Curated annotation (Swiss-Prot):
InterPro entries: UPF0346, YozE_SAM-like, YozE_SAM-like_sf. Belongs to the UPF0346 family. It comes from the Bacteria. This is UPF0346 protein lmo1857. Transmembrane segments: none annotated. Pfam families: YozE_SAM_like.
Length: 77
């Protein structure tokens, strides 16, 4: 079993960059209620839609979710 989406997202953290993916990662890090252990797309979507005003649009999450799935598949073997 691989890592959670949160742990994947943390690879995008950087205090000096200001692109949307990095800002999402930095804000999720500061969000103490973020579902850190889940690998479930629907749980993450529901949480972000209702509890993450720092995410300007779900397309950022969707891009990172796709990258997460590719990374999980690559590291499966």
């Amino acid at each position: 079993m691989g890592r959670s989406f949160y742990h994947f997202l943390m690879t995008y953290r950087d205090p000096k960059l200001t692109d949307q993916k990095t800002e999402f990662a930095n804000n999720a890090y500061r969000d103490h209620s973020f579902p850190k252990q889940t690998r479930n797309y629907h749980i993450l979507c529901d949480y972000l839609e209702f509890n993450a005003p720092y995410l300007p649009g779900m397309s950022i999450f969707d891009e990172l979710w796709d990258a997460y799935l590719l990374d999980e598949e690559k590291n499966k073997h």
